[in-house]
From Swiss-Prot:
Keywords: 4Fe-4S, Chlorophyll, Chromophore, Cyanelle, Electron transport, Iron, Iron-sulfur, Magnesium, Membrane, Metal-binding, Oxidoreductase, Photosynthesis, Photosystem I, Plastid, Thylakoid, Transmembrane, Transmembrane helix, Transport
An annotated GO BP: photosynthesis
Protein known as: Photosystem I P700 chlorophyll a apoprotein A1
Residues that hold phylloquinone according to the record: 694
Protein residues bound to chlorophyll a: 685, 693
PROSITE patterns: PHOTOSYSTEM_I_PSAAB
Membrane topology according to the record: Multi-pass membrane protein
Subcellular location: Plastid, Cyanelle thylakoid membrane
Record-listed E.C. numbers: 1.97.1.12
């Protein structure tokens, strides 16, 4: 007798590994380019070293066996994790060995965090600035001190032990990477078992991960932070294991601990509301989110994800099947709906990676916005340098991941997409009306570009002609962001309605009180006006152009009217052969190349907007009578409404600290500012140049070498067009990002 129909049969979990599939051979790996027959022959021309770097991680080019590619990626993930653990270990070791963490912990409002002391070689010790408490070192802006305090670390010994633990984990990861490729490698069906993967990732990674973190926060972080907030010296606070072993210690701080698990099993959960809270707002002592709110949050997340990890059908015939869900997902106008998508995601890792990069990139930018509006860690909000750097960091990371999503979506289209498997499903229908999508996007970009920039040009012209009454500004013709103001109002009015007994709204950015710590503003209501409306439309413009470029690259990756057989030319190609004029720089790779520049444009405006807005309207000092004096004195609303204002009152005015940093502890940023400009300018040499020029130059240099009987055995070649563009964009972004980094650092460390 069958309980479920045959197609609902459970996926039985089997042993799905191969034993000893690949021998461990150092002799093979020692040969440069061992992964490619052509490269393994060694260099004939200088192009060899470029191809070596371009192809070393392109596992698709080694083999078309999906199982082998999957194993290589899986093994590489362990290698990546090992690098992450080594990097973390270094950060913790610096905290343990070279930092003023314990001094900062006892006085976080006046002492600045430092975890690097420069050795006195050729006068570099000038970089060791006075960070307070008699400590000389480089001020750090990673936010690690704040995170360590939040997790309950009170001594540098604890950091030291954690650093050693991270190295042990790194060794374990390296071993796992070798073991799961050479000794016990999973079969393809293991990688393709989407339901089991979802269950384990949701319940295990997110669910149990959050649960264990909630446990740590409740048993270690909460009591330690409560004592620190009360002014108890870090040396007098019991060690973490004492709180866990001695219930009376923690019951003095949180009385419900005295009752043990009785309220849990009698469903009287309200008893635990002394350490699982819904306060909302920020802790007035530290300017960070309430730790008891965060413990509550992680516990709730754990419950949700552990439940979610039981959603998908594996051994027992209950739960969702990914394939069924996707194929049932049809609308009235969407043809076959998502039929064929399951096969795409289980056979193309590029497609899966693309989706994950798009989601994680967006998430990183969302994180950036929450780090200042709802600062999660104690004393983070008043460390303006760290706030600015964390915002900048998460925004750049998000931008790169989103461009990566476009890149891998295009690689999927070129290498993995099978039109026969995708007839009349949503993906096919999007591809068939791609001209409408791209031309509409193009129109939107033109509209936004002319109108957003036009508003600024109007304002510059009116200000130049001495007609302030005719400008778009809060003092003349107002363009108030009414929808954004409505969202702010709804959120500030919602306190108490969004969560049971919540005392404050989620963020003071929406409205409410000024939270100050140590006479500095941690967070306060952010008022929006005409200036924000204008720059917001520049954001809309630059983001839409980035999307246009990336999406055009994906939708036209396989073919176009110009090159119907593009898929045969591959992901990157310079031109469609001789005699086909106008077919250069149209590969999917070239779209990623252009997308990177617009991503950089887009995010530069975002970072400049954030930096200036916060200095003008949020960050500053609070006097005894509650008056706030902001760093740049509210000049954003009137100065940022002209292009000239951005150049004069933001870029030029705020660059004074980095330009005048020579001879001070910030002088490294002055050198970086200069050097990064040079790297950026160097990129232009590759971007504004033709390959022929370089090849011709090389020929004459080779001629001179031959004359002197000094000719190299490896023939010099100019970079290919694609290589030149790659070198150009890499230096453009490195130069641009390092310029921004040094500009922000010198400015905000001086004034923040």
């Amino acid at each position: 007798m069958r309980i479920s129909p045959p197609e609902r049969e459970a996926k039985k979990v089997k042993i799905v590994i191969d034993k000893d599939p690949v021998s461990t051979s150092f002799d093979k790996w020692a040969v440069p380019g061992h992964f490619s027959r052509t490269l393994a022959k060694g260099p004939k021309t200088t192009t060899w070293i470029w191809n070596l770097h371009a192809d070393v991680h392109d596992f698709d080019s080694y083999t078309s066996d999906l199982e082998d590619v999957s194993r290589k990626i899986f093994s590489a993930h362990f290698g990546h994790l090992a690098v992450v653990f080594i990097w973390l270990s270094g950060a913790y070791f610096h905290g343990a060995r070279f930092s003023n963490y314990e001094a900062w912990l006892s006085n976080p409002t006046t002492i600045k965090p430092s975890a690097q002391v420069v050795w006195p070689i050729v006068g570099q010790e000038i970089l060791n600035g006075d960070v307070g408490g008699g400590f000389q070192g480089i001020q750090i802006t990673s936010g690690l001190f704040q995170m360590w305090r939040a997790s309950g670390i009170t001594t540098e010994l604890q950091l030291y032990v954690t650093a050693i633990g991270a190295l042990v984990m790194a060794a374990l990861m390296l071993f796992a990477g070798w073991f799961h490729y050479h000794k016990a490698a999973p079969k393809l069906e293991w990688f393709q078992n989407a339901e089991s993967m979802m269950n384990h990732h949701l319940a295990g990674l997110f669910g149990l991960g959050s649960l264990s973190w909630a446990g740590h926060q409740i048993h270690v972080s909460l009591p330690v932070n409560k004592l620190l907030d009360s002014g108890v010296s870090p040396q007098e606070i019991p060690l973490p294991h004492e709180f866990i072993l001695n219930k009376d210690l923690i019951a003095q701080l949180y009385p419900s601990f005295g009752q043990g698990l009785t309220p849990f099993f009698t469903l009287n959960w309200n008893e635990y509301s002394d350490f699982l809270t819904f306060k909302g707002g920020l802790n007035p002592v530290t300017g960070g989110l309430w730790l008891s709110d965060r413990a509550h949050h992680h516990l709730a997340i754990a419950v949700l994800f552990i439940v979610a990890g039981h959603m998908y059908r594996t051994n027992w015939g209950i739960g969702h099947s990914m394939k069924e869900m996707l194929e049932t997902h049809k609308g009235p106008f969407t043809g076959e709906g998502h039929k064929g998508l399951y096969e795409i995601f289980t056979n193309s890792w590029h497609a899966q990676l693309s989706l994950n990069l798009a989601l994680f990139g967006s998430l990183s930018i969302i994180v950036a916005h929450h780090m200042y509006s709802m600062p999660p860690y104690p004393y983070l909000a008043t460390d303006y340098a760290t706030s600015l750097c964390l915002f900048t960091h998460h925004v750049w990371i998000g931008g790169f991941l989103i461009v990566g999503a476009g890149a891998h979506a295009a690689i999927f289209m070129v290498r993995d997409y099978d039109p026969a498997q995708n007839y009349n499903n949503l993906l096919d229908r999007v591809l068939r009306h791609r001209d409408a999508i791209i031309s509409h996007l193009n129109w939107v970009c033109i509209f936004l570009g002319f109108h957003s920039f036009g508003l600024y040009i109007h304002n510059d012209t009116m200000r130049a002609l001495g007609r302030p009454q005719d400008m778009f500004s809060d003092a003349a013709i107002q363009l108030q962001p009414v929808f954004a103001q409505w969202v702010q109002g709804v959120n500030s009015a919602a306190a108490g309605n969004t969560a049971p007994n919540a005392l404050r709204n989620a963020s003071y950015a929406f409205g409410g009180d000024i939270v100050s710590v140590g006479e500095k503003v941690a967070m306060m209501p952010i008022s929006l006006g005409t200036a924000d409306f204008l720059v917001h439309h520049i954001h809309a413009f630059t983001i839409h152009v980035t999307v246009l470029i990336l999406l055009k690259g994906v939708l036209f990756a396989r073919n176009s009217r110009l090159i119907p057989d593009k898929a045969n030319l591959g992901f990157r190609f310079p031109c469609d052969g001789p005699g086909r004029g106008g077919t250069c720089q149209v590969s999917a790779w070239d779209h990623v190349f252009l997308g990177l520049f617009w991503m950089y444009n887009s995010l530069s405006v975002v970072l400049f907007h954030f930096s200036w807005k916060m200095q003008s309207d949020v960050w500053g000092n609070v006097t005894a009578d509650g008056a706030v004096s902001h760093i740049t004195g509210n000049n954003f609303a009137q100065s940022s409404i002209t292009i000239n204002g951005w150049l004069r009152d933001f870029l030029w005015a705020q660059a004074s600290q980095v330009i005048q940093s020579y001879g001070s502890a910030l002088s490294a940023y002055g050198l970086m500012f200069l050097g990064a400009h040079f790297i950026w300018a160097f990129s232009l040499m590759f971007l504004f140049s033709g390959r022929g020029y370089w090849q011709e130059l090389i020929e004459s240099i080779v001629w001179a070498h031959n004359k002197l009987k000094f000719a190299p055995s490896i023939q010099p070649r100019a970079l290919s067009i694609t290589q030149g563009r790659a070198v150009g964009v890499a230096h453009y972004l490195l130069g641009g990002i390092a310029t921004t980094w040094s500009f922000f650092h010198a400015r905000i460390i001086s004034v923040g």
